[in-house]
Amino acid sequence: MKNTINIQDQFLNQLRKEGIQVTVFLLNGFQLRGYIKGFDNFTVLLEVQGKQQLIYKHAISTFAPERNIHFETEQ
């Protein structure tokens, strides 16, 4: 079986581990700025001004971190 790289999970996990602030753009145009505290296949837990918000991934358009992240991709 071929191992596949899940870029989405690696990206979100790196943002979480490094505590990088991220702007989340929703499909309705709304923006949330905060820190990723966790995620699963369907949701992202974002801390915004000390409060937690659970966002469904199907409502998200874009993640824009405040700075670039570096992560390794296995080949």
From Swiss-Prot:
Pfam families: Hfq (PF17209). Keywords: RNA-binding, Stress response. Residues 9-69 form the Sm domain. The keyword RNA-binding applies. GO terms for molecular function: RNA binding. GO terms for biological process: regulation of DNA-templated transcription; regulation of RNA stability; regulation of translation, ncRNA-mediated. One of its GO terms (cellular component) is cytosol. Transmembrane segments: none annotated. Belongs to the Hfq family. HAMAP family: Hfq. Homohexamer. RNA chaperone that binds small regulatory RNA (sRNAs) and mRNAs to facilitate mRNA translational regulation in response to envelope stress, environmental stress and changes in metabolite concentrations. Also binds with high specificity to tRNAs. This is RNA-binding protein Hfq.
